[in-house]
Design a protein with these regions (language model features):
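Catalytic cores of eukaryotic secretory-pathway lumenal/extracellular enzymes that build
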Residues: 2-27, 152-184, 191-194
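Alpha/beta-hydrolase
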Residues: 1-128
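Loop/turn elements at helix/coil->beta-strand transitions in domains of secreted/extracellular proteins
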Residues: 196-199
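Short beta-strand/loop motif that positions the catalytic acidic residue
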Residues: 202-204
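Acidic catalytic loop of the alpha/beta-hydrolase fold
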Residues: 207-208
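Extracytoplasmic/secreted envelope proteins and their assembly/folding machinery
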Residues: 65, 185-188
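Small-residue-rich helix-loop
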Residues: 99-179
Length: 208
């Protein structure tokens, strides 16, 4: 259990899209319509429910679990045992548990055949990373060398290889910081106001 409520809210529409793709939820509806339905539930029902926490009645908890099951394709009883909070690695492991497969985190359409079917999360890593990482890294290095003429005296490390050691605190060491979801919007906004020519690309797919 972790207490970053924001993560449960931001992940839910992508979980719904991924469940739709794997035919575990939303069948008979278009992807766009189903994801929009999930977003509306997230904004109007799920967010207030998470903030109510233990003040929710048993009936309300049951209703939320039922809707979550509808959107993300997991068993309602499992969702209730999870206190209506599904951690991403558990979703990756459980959505296709009946097939012994884990799904990707970077891209939920990818699947990996798992040897350990009862682990809490994918035990081989992220299927969408280990299935594309070699090709992605090779293409990126080729682009750097042949198109950008960048000369490197050491191997280029992809983000997946170093991400686990990333320092997430947005303030210098020793400065007070109240733990919270990572939010760099303030710093980014300040930088863009100082540099009015700066352009920012935000890219995220339905299944990311």
């Amino acid at each position: 259990m972790h207490d970053n409520i924001t993560s449960y809210l931001t992940y839910l529409p992508s979980m719904a899209a991924t469940a739709w793709y794997h035919k575990k939820a939303g069948q008979g509806k278009t992807l766009e319509a189903f994801v929009e339905e999930a977003r509306n539930f997230t904004y109007n029902t799920y967010a207030p429910a998470l903030y109510k926490g233990s003040l929710l009645s048993a009936s309300e908890q049951n209703s939320i679990a039922e809707k979550l099951s509808y959107f993300i394709g997991l068993d309602k009883a499992y969702i209730l045992r999870s206190n209506n909070r599904i951690l991403m690695h558990r979703f990756q492991k459980n959505l296709l548990a009946d097939k012994g497969l884990a799904i990707g985190r970077l891209d939920g359409r990818f699947m990996g055949d798992e040897a350990d079917d009862v682990s809490e999360g994918p035990n081989l890593g992220d299927p969408s990373s280990y299935q594309i990482e070699a090709a992605y890294t090779a293409a990126l290095n080729h682009y750097f060398a042949e198109t950008l003429n960048v000369e490197m005296d050491r191997p280029y490390m992809t983000s997946g290889q170093i991400g686990g050691k990333w320092r997430w605190k947005p303030v210098p060491d020793g400065q007070y910081w109240e733990p919270m979801p990572v939010n760099t919007a303030g710093q980014l906004g300040e930088t863009m106001r100082r540099n009015t020519e700066m352009k920012v690309l935000v890219a995220s797919g339905y299944y990311d």
